Amino acid sequence: DAANVVKQIKAAGQWDNTILFVFTDHGGKMARAKQFCYDEGLHVPLIIAGGALPKELRGTTRKDLINLLDITATSMAFAGIDIPEWMDSKDLFAKGYGRKYIFSNRDRCDFTIERIRSVMGERFHYIRNFLTDRVLYQHNYRSKGEPFKTLKKMHEEGKLTPAQAAGWEKRAPEELYDLQADPNEIKNLATDPKYKKVLDEYRAALEGWLKDTDDKAADGESKEGLRATMTRWGKNCINPEFKGLTPLPMPKKEKIINKKPKKNKKVKK
C-alpha cells in the first residue's frame, strides 16, 4: 500500500528527491463503475505528495476538473522536462491551467463490444450511447460474479427499482445529468426542453472532440481483430459483430525446455 511505499522510499534516503502520485482504480465491483462512463467510473481520488513537492503546494486541495492524463505532463514539469506541444496532457500546476470539459470513452473490453462517449463539465455530464441495440449490462467478464449475479437475479424477480433495473432496459441514445441536483446520475434530462441549450452545448463539445481526436471507433472493429478476439475468448463472443466470423488459428505453442545445466564431471587423472 501507499504507506509501505513511503516507508521504503524514506528508508532508501530518497524522500526529499521524490514526488509521489497516488490514485486508485474505479470501482470494479460496483455496477455502473468500472468500464462505464458514469461518475462512479470516472471520479477517482488523487493525492500528490513527497519531500520534493514545492512547499507552496503542500497541504493544498483542488476542486477543479482535472484529467489523470495530466499526470504525465505534471511529472515531466516537476522533472524539468519540456512538454511537447502535441501532447494532450497538461501540467496541473502551470499558470492558467484549466479544463472546461473532461472527455471519456468506452469501447470493446475483452469480448464485450461497446461504444460510449461522454463529456463532463463543472455541473453537467453528457453521455452518448452509440450501440443502443444492446443493454448497458450486456454479457461481460463480471456477469458471473457479484454484484451482477445477484442484481440480475433480482431484476428477473422484479425486485429492483426502475433506477436499479435501468442497466437491463433499453438505453437512451443520449443522457444528460445535473451533477449538482442529481450527483448519482439518475434523472436523464436529455429530453427535457428546459435543458436544450445545455444539451446543444455538450453535443457540440463532444462532436468537436471526436473530430479533433479522429475517433477511429466510428469505423467499427476490423474482421481480423474480431476473429482474434474470438480466438482469445471463445464462446463469450456473442455480440452480433461476431456473427459469421471464425476464430483465427491458435498460434503454435513453443515448447520451452528448462533443464538445469549438467555439472562437469571430474576427470580422473
List where the protein language model places each region.
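Long, internal low-complexity/basic segments
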Residues: 43, 157-174, 179-269
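Alpha-helical packing segments of well-folded alpha/beta enzyme cores
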Residues: 1-5, 71, 198, 202-206
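Short beta-strand segments enriched in hydrophobic/aromatic residues
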Residues: 50, 130, 222-225
